[in-house]
Swiss-Prot record:
<dbReference type="InterPro" id="IPR045864">
    <property type="entry name" value="aa-tRNA-synth_II/BPL/LPL"/>
</dbReference>
<comment type="subunit">
    <text>Tetramer of two alpha and two beta subunits.</text>
</comment>
<dbReference type="InterPro" id="IPR004188">
    <property type="entry name" value="Phe-tRNA_ligase_II_N"/>
</dbReference>
<keyword id="KW-0479">Metal-binding</keyword>
<keyword id="KW-0030">Aminoacyl-tRNA synthetase</keyword>
<dbReference type="Pfam" id="PF01409">
    <property type="entry name" value="tRNA-synt_2d"/>
</dbReference>
<keyword id="KW-0460">Magnesium</keyword>
<dbReference type="GO" id="GO:0004826">
    <property type="term" value="F:phenylalanine-tRNA ligase activity"/>
</dbReference>
<dbReference type="InterPro" id="IPR022911">
    <property type="entry name" value="Phe_tRNA_ligase_alpha1_bac"/>
</dbReference>
<dbReference type="InterPro" id="IPR006195">
    <property type="entry name" value="aa-tRNA-synth_II"/>
</dbReference>
<dbReference type="GO" id="GO:0005737">
    <property type="term" value="C:cytoplasm"/>
</dbReference>
<dbReference type="InterPro" id="IPR010978">
    <property type="entry name" value="tRNA-bd_arm"/>
</dbReference>
<keyword id="KW-0067">ATP-binding</keyword>
<dbReference type="Pfam" id="PF02912">
    <property type="entry name" value="Phe_tRNA-synt_N"/>
</dbReference>
<keyword id="KW-0963">Cytoplasm</keyword>
<dbReference type="GO" id="GO:0000049">
    <property type="term" value="F:tRNA binding"/>
</dbReference>
<feature type="binding site">
    <location>
        <position position="264"/>
    </location>
    <ligand>
        <name>Mg(2+)</name>
    </ligand>
</feature>
Length: 360
């Protein structure tokens, strides 16, 4: 094994690497000059057959040659990879100065935003969000809530009846589109052991014509609390907290006696007009469109849960008491943002939703 032969093998490998114009050609040269059948690999195997005194010198010579070959291979591979990457950047370059068609961002509907905001107030107080079916059994929608069989709300002119089992129709079907979210409360009392603290947002249906102040499909949010020792004071404090969180710490509320089948005693809750703060009452120089110069805005109905409702839903009225409250989201949104026509909320016109922001 002559030194000049080893040098020739090394030089041929270096020349082949330098001549490779791309990574594929370099791979072929690599196999030819560093693979198992390459000249340097064969020379390395022949070292074992040399006399002992010649092995060290031959091994050193072959090792130096193979080291130079591997170093040159790595350097050439790095060069070719850099050239490839630069070429790809040029070929796949994107001209960021070109104009493009802007896709407008969407906006959450203000009804959704406000309903979630109200629900968050109660969730922060420890209430749980509860949901139920919109196509509801008449028992949950009326009977469980102490609506008598002859109550006007159960008539077809006020309620959407759905075709029931075996083709029964009208008020004989026993199935309705829920007229309020109160059936969720009845289901919750039947499914859970007290204490129960829930808030129930959702869509409800009534046979109203779509006009500036009515819609047959609207949204309600109700809450229910069932526990030992609850009183009207707890209800008043809870609702005061909601109003002050949503409208400001200086907001005042009042309760007016009323009647609802599912609560006893019952009341309508009003809050001080957040626009005029009551200063428009008896003051023709400062009329207020929001409260019609009455100084108060009606929020919704509330009261202590009727013992008959507790009994129907499996709760012992001798041990537990509860309170409930509910109001319509659309009406409250009309007050908050001076929306004059409720149809704007349901027609899907982005010109209505966009100004409310909340882009996603």
């Amino acid at each position: 094994m002559k030194p000049e032969e080893i040098e020739r093998m090394r030089d041929e490998a270096l020349a082949a690497f330098a001549a490779a114009g791309d990574l594929d050609a370099l791979q072929e040269a690599k196999v030819a000059h560093t693979g198992g059948t390459s000249p340097l690999a064969l020379a390395n195997r022949e070292i074992g057959a040399l006399p002992p005194h010649a092995k060290a010198a031959a091994g050193k010579l072959v090792g130096q040659a193979r080291g130079a070959v591997n170093k040159a291979l790595g350097a050439r591979q790095a060069e070719l990879e850099a050239e490839r990457d630069a070429r790809v950047l040029v070929e796949e370059a994107v001209d960021v100065t070109l104009p493009y068609d802007r896709v407008p961002a969407g906006a959450r509907h203000p009804l959704t935003t406000f309903m979630e905001r109200v629900a968050d107030v109660f969730v922060a107080m420890g209430y749980e969000i509860a949901e139920g079916p919109e196509v509801e059994a008449e028992w949950f929608n009326f009977d469980a809530l102490n609506f008598t069989p002859d109550h006007p709300a159960r008539q077809m002119q006020d309620t959407f009846f759905v075709e029931g089992p075996k083709g029964t129709e009208g008020d004989e079907s026993g199935v309705v589109l829920r007229t309020h979210t109160s059936p969720v409360q009845a289901r919750a009392m039947l499914d859970r052991e007290p204490p129960v603290y829930i808030v129930c947002p959702g869509r409800v249906y009534r046979t109203d014509e779509l006009d500036a102040t009515h819609t047959p499909v609207f949204h309600q949010i109700e809450l229910l609390a069932i526990d030992e020792g609850l009183t009207m004071a707890d209800l008043k404090g809870t609702l005061d907290h909601m109003v002050q969180t949503l409208f400001g710490a200086d907001m005042k509320t009042r309760l007016r006696p009323n009647y609802f089948p599912f609560t006893e005693p019952s009341a309508e809750m009003d809050m001080l007009c957040y626009v005029c703060k009551g200063e428009s009452v008896g003051n023709p120089d400062r009329p207020c469109r929001t409260c019609s110069s009455e100084g108060w805005i009606e929020l919704g109905g509330c009261g202590m849960v009727n013992p008959r409702v507790l009994t129907a839903c499996g709760v012992d009225p001798e041990k537990y008491s509860g309170f409930a409250f509910g109001f319509g989201i659309e009406r409250m949104l009309m007050f908050r943002h001076n929306v004059e026509d409720m149809r704007d909320m349901v027609e899907g016109d982005v010109r209505f939703t966009r100004p409310f922001g909340m882009e996603i």
